[in-house]
Amino acid sequence: MSISLTRKHFLGLAGATIGAAAMAACAGPSTDGAGTALKTLSPDEWSKIKPASSISFMSSHPGKSRDTEMKLIEAFQSANPGITVNLITGGSNYEEVAQKFQTAQAGSEVPDVVVASDVWWFRYAVSGAILPIDDLLKAVGVSTSDYNPGLIGDYKHANQQWAVPYARSTPLFYFNKDHFKAAGVPERAPATWEEFAEWAPGIKSANSAGSGYQNAYQYPAIAGYAGWTLQNVLWGQGGSWSKEWDITADSEASVAAMQWVQDSIVKQGWAGVSSKNAITDLQAGAVSATISSSADLAATLKAAKEANMRIGVGFLPGGSAASTQVCPTGGSGLVVASKTSPERQLAAAKFVTFVTNAQSTTALSAATGYLPVAAAADISSIVAQTPEFQTVVDQLKVTRTQDFARTFLPGGDQELAKAATKIMNEKADVKSTLTELRGTLEGIYNKDVEPKLKA
């Protein structure tokens, strides 16, 4: 039996009232009532503040974007000569940045602006580590309407805005066109996983003589990817990690979906699991297809061109229960630390809105494959140079909100990865593993949520 984290159950988490109503695609949890108790300045008070002369920006440089981030910082400093920005490498991924930001909370110096992933911004908000930025945005002359409505809506909580979208992405289906051609299958992404399962044995057979060839399909490395990308297979077969606040990881449909995943590796043998980076495996010609972030698009196409390899991209495949809206969004936003001075917070607001404006987001999108987050962004030049980018933009229209078990239960994503490791790498019994996962997620609720409930 699944646990239902209803509005009544979840009332009071860090002073927030979190509704369990269904969310629209690409939107944060619906909320009403009181928000997290943080004192913020009014628009009139912000107007009397002078921005600090120096701030820091902690990033993992998502999508290998460090050079682009440096260019954006230089452009910001040129437009705001009184403010300098110190770029801090917080780690090689979102989790490492989160750990460093959390550690900094114990000291007197915290970074002013932080890249916050889809599984971290909410925790920062309810813990009071970041500042609601509604009035800050007004103070620097920016409106939430300046952003893609679905992406900016991801960061709405307790009737307040907690972040702006930055390096936002969706997974894409990447495939080697030459491998598909050799197998005599269509040079396109499969419409469903069932269709790909029909193609896969032929694809593997036709390309197995290639040096270092492994599999027709490579599941992404489990750490950081399993909880995110496996939602696609689950949703396509009518399953999920959770439905709103109900944990459904061991429902009949979820078990069937994950059994299909295990069978593709163990019984049918046309799929494998990457030990490090599935997109690198694809670029090396070791596999014929994989799923990876749209942020990998530019680098993958560049590598393919250099290797005289034809790489195609497409929507994520559907399944027997759903053929569309089976793609999650992902990536990160920018948050402003609550522990710094108003002067630094105002300078931070100037910076985050500059690096997410139409010109800046277009530059980041062109360099990586991340989604343009500004409503006024003109992607025509990107599509002209990289036609595959249109797929990224088009797929955004049919995305689905991620399961709460991954994004809003503290540590939930790591637990999903542990379960996936057992199922995909250790050949564990699927049903019992997912039942154990459900119990673990319930335990997270009991330990990390229930103690904070209001009496």
Per-range role (PLM):
Residues E74, S78-A79, K181-A183, V255, ...:
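Extracytoplasmic/periplasmic substrate-recognition and gating elements
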Residues E74-Y147, K181-G184, S288-A289, K305, ...:
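Extracytoplasmic "Venus flytrap"/periplasmic binding protein-like
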Residues H157-Y166, P171, E194-D246, V287:
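Extracytoplasmic/periplasmic solute-binding protein
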Residues G150, D154, G314-F315, A366-K418, ...:
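Long, aromatic- and glycine/proline-rich binding clefts that accommodate carbohydrate-like moieties
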Residues W199-K204, E244-G272, L316:
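Glycine-centered hinge/linker elements that transmit conformational signals in sensory
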Residues P51-P62, I83-I88, V113:
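Short, well-ordered beta-strand elements
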